[in-house]
Amino acid sequence: MRRGVPMAGNFLQQENVVLTGACEAIVVDVQCIFPALGPLSKCFHTKFITTSPIAQMPDAEFIRFNAETAGENAKAIVKMAIDNFKNRKPELVHIPQLKQKATVGYSVEAIVKVLDGVTNSQVDETGTTKPLLECITSGVIRGAVAMVGCNNPKIRPDYAHIELMKKCIANDIVVIASGCSAQAAAKAGLMDKSAKDLCGAGLKRVCELADIPPVLHMGSCVDISRMMILAAELAKDAGLQINQLPVVGCAPEWMSEKAVSIGNYVVGTGIDTFLGVDPYVSGSSEMGELLTEGTRKWTGAAYTVETDIEKLVDLMIERIEEKRTASVSYTHLR
């Protein structure tokens, strides 16, 4: 995971970065690229650089990244940016002074290490998720939400992510976030350890004991596999199937094509997934039924779509509580 490199912002802020007049180079690969970046960069001194042969764009310089020479390719781009600094126009520079603290970098290994820090090494087994399971079993934490996905220019940016997270943590539901959703949380201060004061009594106590924020940053949106590995570890340590865990996924502002594959991965793994933007399947009632009900026969999970954020979070909490009491085989999670 990234080390020592602060986040500048998420998807819908990429043009704003250029507008500061302080961006020597903006580098993209193949995803979530605004088409206006090329002409916008020409209005400033910014170099717009693409790195993939399948995503070359007008008004861009192309530097192909190869696995064998990636380090040298990166150094060449950094040198271009350094050399371009002299072309910065002071009269066009405006750097906002808004900053927010965030604790990031919670891989599966990092989370297990945090959990080891609150175990009794003389009695308890280390290197497992059992301390977290004990919190869930006792009801101190009700469950977890994997919050993933984009900002969407069709709706108010970040609002859904932030409001959903606030209500979840207030109801003692820990949030694991990635990608643009995680950056929305960071900007709102939800990844600062002081955000524990927004939590319910149970989650607040856990945050204090483990010295963590209530919203954990787990990487980019395509790091969804980390979340699924964590879910698999929880299921293994609990002796349950993944679709029995009191865990849900959510992409309240999804926009990108990759969000479709990420969502299908989560549902296919057995975790109910909640969307705040309608998927483009309304032309087929059969497809709509398949996604919202049919997949449950195969994986034990399906999509729920609700564009009203207040109703969406209530449905998420309701599903988590249902999971806690759904089967006699795991009534210890009540």
Walk through the language-model features, giving the residues of each:
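Conserved, well-structured core segments that form the ligand-binding/active-site neighborhood
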Residues: 1-138, 147-151, 156-187, 192-195, ...
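Conserved small/polar residues in nucleotide/adenosyl-binding loops
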Residues: 331-334
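Active-site capping/gating regions of soluble enzymes
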Residues: 232-233, 266-268
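Redox cofactor-anchoring modules in respiratory/redox and cofactor-processing assemblies
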Residues: 226, 255, 260-264
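Long insertion/accessory domains within large nucleic-acid-processing enzymes
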Residues: 220-228, 232
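Catalytic core of carbohydrate-active enzymes
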Residues: 144
